[in-house]
Regions:
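A glycine- and Lys/Arg-enriched "phosphate-lid" helix/loop adjacent to the NTP-binding pocket
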Residues: 130-154, 164-216
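Pre-Walker A adenine-sensing motif
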Residues: 43-49
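Glycine-rich phosphate-binding P-loop
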Residues: 60-73
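Conserved nucleotide-sensing/catalytic segment adjacent to the nucleotide-binding pocket
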Residues: 89, 96-140
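Short beta-strand-centered segment that lines the nucleotide-binding/catalytic pocket of NTP-utilizing
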Residues: 83-92
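Conserved small/polar residues in nucleotide/adenosyl-binding loops
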Residues: 258-264
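Small-molecule kinase domains that catalyze NTP-dependent phosphoryl transfer to phosphate-bearing small molecules
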Residues: 158, 177, 202-241
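Charged, amphipathic alpha-helical linker segments immediately N-terminal to NTP-binding catalytic cores
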Residues: 1-35
């Protein structure tokens, strides 16, 4: 629970470390601890799948270049693909805009016994939408867009996540907390390293202008929606090896919680 945001806790991301803040040996973690964690995670994922009762949703949110894709690759690629599904949520399509903002999220929920991994999520609709005033482009009736719209959405999200938990689908939400300097370095590497050119988008550079606004809104998002049934974890993301290890431990703990000692 070291990185868990407690329900009702006042959150300011400025107060949270972006670097490895544990006294651990990097090479030992990478070669021994991580290997053991992934083996255990594979075992408990198999139990979750065999028991076919609970479903698990892992949400990854972060600033650009915080390591969402790399974390998914290194933590989840060792699991049985029959029981793991990764969904990346990008800008809503025309069809998605014709529905409520949770419609596409509901469609992507995993089956019982499965793990769904959300690369970004419904939280885009309380952060990115606000940063860029995209609510004006939505088809939501204008009389519903008032000063309380964001408080309303937070309530809707809390209610929906509680509903899922009460039906056996548990959500673990992870915010990869990267520093502005580290993000700059990673974006520069995408430009300079030909093997990473495909990752680069000029939009990532433009988004840096809104850094402070994003930090404030992500802080508010975590504060408003970290609950006992659907907690947020704020994970340092400046050291990729450490980030991946911490995420593996968080997911492993969730799998342990929702599996019986042996498959039925």
């Amino acid at each position: 629970d070291r990185y868990r945001a407690k329900e009702g806790e006042k959150i300011s991301l400025k107060k949270f470390s972006t670097n490895c803040d544990m006294d651990v040996d990097k090479e030992y973690v990478k070669t021994v601890s991580m290997t053991a964690a992934l083996e255990e995670l594979s075992l408990y994922q198999a139990k979750l799948y065999a028991q076919n009762t609970y479903g698990l949703i892992i949400v990854l949110q972060a600033m650009d270049a915080a390591g969402k894709d790399g974390t998914i690759k290194h933590v989840f690629s060792h699991l049985d693909p029959n029981g793991v599904h990764v969904v990346s949520f990008k800008q809503p399509t025309t069809e998605e805009k014709d529905h409520d903002y949770m419609w596409r999220i509901n469609k992507a929920l995993p089956r019982r016994g499965n793990i769904g991994i959300f690369n970004r999520s419904h939280y885009e609709d309380v952060v990115v939408t606000r940063v860029h005033d995209l609510i004006e482009n939505d088809k939501i009736p204008k009389d519903l867009v008032d000063k309380n719209i964001w408080e309303t959405r937070y309530r809707q999200i809390r209610d929906w996540e509680r509903y899922l938990a009460e039906n056996g689908f548990h959500m673990v939400k992870i915010f990869l907390h990267v520093s502005k300097d580290e993000q700059r370095d990673r974006l520069a590497e995408r430009i300079l390293n030909k093997k990473k050119n495909w990752k680069f988008s000029i939009a990532d550079i433009n988004e840096r202008r809104f850094w402070d606004r994003y930090q404030d809104l992500y802080s508010e998002m975590i504060e408003e929606t970290s609950t006992e049934k659907a907690p947020w974890y704020i994970v340092p993301a400046d050291n990729k090896w450490f980030t991946r290890y911490v995420v593996s431990q968080i997911v492993l703990k969730a799998c342990l919680l929702y599996t019986s000692p042996s498959p039925r």
